[in-house]
Amino acid sequence: RCGKVLADRLMRMYSRVTVAERKESARAQAEAFGFDSVPFPLLPHLQKYGKEYAYIFNTVPKKVLTSKELENVSGEVTIIDIASRPGGTDFEYCRANKMNAVQALGLPGKYAPKRSAEVLMKVIEQHIN
């Protein structure tokens, strides 16, 4: 739920948004709303396009951004993980490689999904400005 709200808010800020979904029907729905979509696992996509991402948001509470995925993204990327604990990002790898990664684990559970997206937008706007 939070991922959908977040994707919508990012698109309203004129961002190009790519949504990763396991189910083909969910990817089709994302594309119907104007988002790009990719299937899990992410590695094949990131090997080809990973350096193009400025921001990566994770809402999956299991490791989907492991060292294998992260070595294929730009060192300039900002990763924001809002999944429930334990999160889905290898933060040890991020620290060791001086990647900008924010742990906001469980944020949607602490606030409503809409409010969480608004909070994240403020963080992004501060980072951009």
PLM feature spans:
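Hydrophobic/small residue at the entry helix of a nucleotide-binding pocket
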Residues: 1-3
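Active-site capping/gating segments
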Residues: 87, 99-129
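Rossmann-like adenosine-cofactor binding region
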Residues: 30-107
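NAD(P)-binding Rossmann-fold cofactor-contacting core
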Residues: 12-34
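Aromatic pocket-lining residues of Rossmann-like dinucleotide-binding sites
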Residues: 6-10
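Short Gly/charged-rich anion-binding patches and loops
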Residues: 5, 25, 89
